């Protein structure tokens, strides 16, 4: 007799750059271990790869993380983390005035959003006759 398969809850969010709705699930213990090992290595490439792998698996392989803007991936990861570990993250913020004092701050991850200015454009002028158009 096979063991029953446990289902994890699924949630939905809107990707900031495309307004596309995607489904996601909280990360599991194995994915949290991958993230913790990457963080312990202090290697940025490993951390980014771990986040990409977690976003890909927690969105049921429906998101192409290799071509996605980094701000979208970070937004999706924050939502996954909020549902997995807790919606409030405790931070210690260095006082910008004296650069010595730390303040404890609770950050509600569900209230984090991508901010786009009114004058934002996907075109970046490099010179008068050369530029780059971002694909997001």
Task: Describe these PLM feature segments.
Residues 1-136:
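Short, surface-exposed, charged amphipathic helix/loop patches that serve as local interaction elements
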